[in-house]
């Protein structure tokens, strides 16, 4: 798909370059044709003014005859015909350029349509793939979070159980310590009473 898009873009770029070239050539032909029209109009005006000058001044006709006006007019007519032929050729060339432009534009529109369709297809596919990838990634993250939550719950339960056991052990140790202290206190009192009891008979004997 990417190769097709690259080819379409390359073809479209080529068509645009050709379009610019033909457009420039067509503008040049139009300018040349307009210049020829002006030259033909100027020559026709000159040809129309020349006989009027002959009629206005008859004496000048004799003087002008030495310049062979008929030959001059014939030459001008030949030039006009040549210019008209050149103008026709230019217009034919211009029409060919216009046909080429229409063909290029038709191909360009077709290429752009294919490009738009291809881009829509390509744009949809990555979005779908990205959506699927993101969905899979999110599902994986959810699974990992659930696993971590289960581990944390087990750890909390273990900590709670361990804390309870420690608390029970501490309570037991405190109780045992208290009992030992009580026993120690009882033993100490018993010893003290025993000593006092033994000391009393000895004192009576000495007396």
From Swiss-Prot:
Keyword flag Nucleotide-binding: no
Q: Where in the cell is it found?
A: Cytoplasm
Q: Where are the annotated coiled coils located?
A: 70-102, 162-192
This protein's UniProt keywords: Coiled coil, Cytoplasm
Instruction: Set out the biological process GO terms recorded for this chain's protein.
Output: negative regulation of hippo signaling
Is Amino-acid biosynthesis among the key words of this record? no
- Main site of residence? cytoplasm
**Cellular component GO terms, alphabetical:** cytoplasm; FAR/SIN/STRIPAK complex
One of the record's GO molecular function terms: protein-macromolecule adaptor activity
| UniProt xrefs under Pfam families | SIKE
Quaternary structure per UniProt? Answer: Interacts with IKBKE and TBK1 via its coiled coil region. Interaction with TBK1 is disrupted upon viral infection or TLR3 stimulation. Interacts with CDC42BPB. Interacts with SIKE1 which mediates association with the STRIPAK core complex composed of PP2A catalytic and scaffolding subunits, the striatins (PP2A regulatory subunits), the striatin-associated proteins MOB4, STRIP1 and STRIP2, PDCD10 and members of the STE20 kinases, such as STK24 and STK26.
The entry's function note states: Physiological suppressor of IKK-epsilon and TBK1 that plays an inhibitory role in virus- and TLR3-triggered IRF3. Inhibits TLR3-mediated activation of interferon-stimulated response elements (ISRE) and the IFN-beta promoter. May act by disrupting the interactions of IKBKE or TBK1 with TICAM1/TRIF, IRF3 and RIGI. Does not inhibit NF-kappa-B activation pathways. Associates with the striatin-interacting phosphatase and kinase (STRIPAK) core complex, forming the extended (SIKE1:SLMAP)STRIPAK complex.
**Similarity comment:** Belongs to the SIKE family.
Listed name of the protein:
Suppressor of IKBKE 1
Query: What is the originating organism of this protein?
Result: Rattus norvegicus
* Gene this protein is translated from: Sike1
């Amino acid at each position: 798909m990417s190769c097709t898009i690259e080819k379409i873009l390359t073809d479209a770029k080529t068509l645009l370059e050709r379009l610019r070239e033909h457009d420039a050539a067509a503008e040049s032909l139009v300018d040349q044709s307009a210049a020829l029209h002006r030259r033909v109009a100027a020559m026709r005006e000159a040809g129309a003014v020349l006989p009027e000058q002959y009629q206005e001044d008859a004496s000048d006709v004799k003087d002008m005859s030495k310049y062979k006006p008929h030959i001059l007019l014939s030459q001008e007519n030949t030039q006009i015909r040549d210019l008209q032929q050149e103008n026709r050729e230019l217009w034919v060339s211009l029409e060919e350029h216009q046909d080429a432009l229409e063909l290029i534009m038709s191909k360009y529109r077709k290429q752009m349509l294919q490009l738009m369709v291809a881009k829509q297809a390509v744009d949809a596919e990555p979005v779908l793939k990205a959506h699927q990838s993101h969905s899979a990634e999110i599902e994986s993250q959810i699974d990992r979070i659930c696993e971590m939550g289960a581990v944390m719950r087990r750890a909390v339960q273990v900590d709670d159980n361990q804390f309870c056991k420690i608390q029970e052990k501490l309570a037991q140790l405190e109780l045992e310590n208290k009992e030992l202290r009580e026993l120690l206190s009882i033993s100490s009192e018993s010893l003290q009473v025993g000593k006092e009891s033994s000391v009393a008979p000895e004192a009576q004997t000495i007396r």
